[in-house]
């Protein structure tokens, strides 16, 4: 790695996962380029912010109420509470058919506490970890959780084997060192405990069809792009055995306004055609482009 100007920007000249210097540039949207490793298939963004710069993005409330959610952040994360709660209910119904019936659960990157709230509904003692107090305070102030740790997972002080279930929704694509993140999660899991990891699939048919217009190419924040093979390798290197990988439950409930906003990335005319949907008020739709994967892995 070489640091280029400005000083907070890092140029990534080797695969962050396998270390190979053999890669191709999938496409460029200056100042960013998306590279693909020719050895393992991982995708990554270069240049990217350093760790402090990345952390700073999520501390600013403009990330959680973004004027340009197509490229960074969310239009209004807190106001979509009902959509997130129902999304997590649907996902956890799938997970808990295969996971522990209760116990202690940790949501990594818990944001406003929506998944924690559903875990509590399902009978778990819910904990969270969140680097942004800006959004994490919602879990405390709105849901009454006093079990949110503010900081990276590496600073959590719970004893090894403390948790029966750990969830990571839309986390690994944001972090500089996902290998260390997962190793820490492995230490925190009880023997036989379950890790649930969800991230985008750069090799999904939808991602391939859209190319640079794929809505998960948000270069300032999504700095890594995984495939099923790279996720499985990463988990095994951390001491976790992947048991199931599915795209079926990676969808989410969204507002009609969200659909119109995302359509703008595909074509302005499509966005204009769908704009009347925004007049439907609180109407919602369950969307699944089969481009997000959920992996269940055991601590063995």
What is each model feature region?
Residues 170, 174:
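A short His-aromatic
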Residues 179-194:
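A short glycine-rich, Lys/Arg-flanked "PGG" loop and its adjoining helix->strand segment in the class I
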Residues 197-224, 229-235, 258-261:
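Short, glycine-/aromatic-enriched active-site segment of Class I SAM-dependent methyltransferases
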